[in-house]
From Swiss-Prot:
One of its GO terms (cellular component) is proton-transporting ATP synthase complex. Keywords: ATP synthesis, Cell membrane, CF(0), Hydrogen ion transport, Ion transport, Membrane, Transmembrane, Transmembrane helix, Transport. Its main location: membrane. F(1)F(0) ATP synthase produces ATP from ADP in the presence of a proton or sodium gradient. F-type ATPases consist of two structural domains, F(1) containing the extramembraneous catalytic core and F(0) containing the membrane proton channel, linked together by a central stalk and a peripheral stalk. During catalysis, ATP synthesis in the catalytic domain of F(1) is coupled via a rotary mechanism of the central stalk subunits to proton translocation. It comes from the Bacteria. InterPro entries: ATP_synth_B-like_membr_sf (IPR028987), ATP_synth_b/b'su_bac/chlpt (IPR002146), ATP_synth_F0_bsu_bac (IPR005864), ATP_synthase_B_chain (IPR050059). The chain crosses the membrane at residues 11-31. HAMAP family: ATP_synth_b_bprime. It is found in: Cell membrane. This is ATP synthase subunit b. It comes from Listeria innocua serovar 6a (strain ATCC BAA-680 / CLIP 11262). F-type ATPases have 2 components, F(1) - the catalytic core - and F(0) - the membrane proton channel. F(1) has five subunits: alpha(3), beta(3), gamma(1), delta(1), epsilon(1). F(0) has three main subunits: a(1), b(2) and c(10-14). The alpha and beta chains form an alternating ring which encloses part of the gamma chain. F(1) is attached to F(0) by a central stalk formed by the gamma and epsilon chains, while a peripheral stalk is formed by the delta and b chains. It is a single-pass membrane protein. One of its GO terms (molecular function) is proton-transporting ATPase activity, rotational mechanism.
């Protein structure tokens, strides 16, 4: 079997322990001077770099949110402007429609009045022409009656004959 001093290697002495602790302390000091400080410097630089990247990312996110808000505002303004333009176009179209209807009504009234005036004028002309024809016919009949002494039947035939001639002249 193994004996305890062979397992441990040798007997434990304070001198060896003190030397081991002293060597370990020197090793720690050397590691701290040559390895720990540069390692901590690199870690600090890395921390600062990551911090600046996080700050830049947050700033970019804030700018993106601001840009998004601006774009939403511009889009909303464009919607409002387009809605206003549509409403204005509708109102303008309605005004133009009303103006066209008014103009058409005025024109139809004018044409109607002109037609009435033309009809009245034509009626007056027809009445005037008829009066002239009746007057000349009356004079003609009277002259024939004076020329002849006609009885009632001949007078009636004479009048009928002149009326038929008048109808044929038209």
């Amino acid at each position: 079997m193994l004996q305890p001093h062979l397992v441990i290697g040798s007997a434990f002495t304070f001198g060896d322990a003190f030397f081991t602790l002293f060597a370990f302390a020197i090793l720690l000091v050397l590691i701290r001077i040559y390895a720990w400080k540069p390692l901590m410097g690199v870690m600090k630089e890395r921390e600062e770099h990551i911090g600046s990247e996080i700050d830049a990312a947050e700033e970019s996110r804030a700018q993106a949110e601001q840009l998004l808000a601006e774009q939403k505002s511009v889009l909303q303004q464009a919607r409002v402007e387009s809605q206003t333009m549509i409403e204005n176009a509708k109102q303008l179209g309605e005004k133009e429609r009303e103006e066209i209807v008014k103009t058409a009504r005025r024109e139809s009234e004018r044409i109607k009045e002109e037609a009435k005036a033309d009809i009245a004028r034509e009626k007056e002309d027809a009445i005037s022409a008829l009066r002239e024809q009746v007057g000349s016919l009356s004079v003609l009949i009277a002259s024939k009656v004076i020329e002849k002494n006609l009885d009632e039947k001949e007078q009636s035939n004479l009048i009928q004959d002149y009326i038929e001639r008048l109808g044929d002249d038209k």
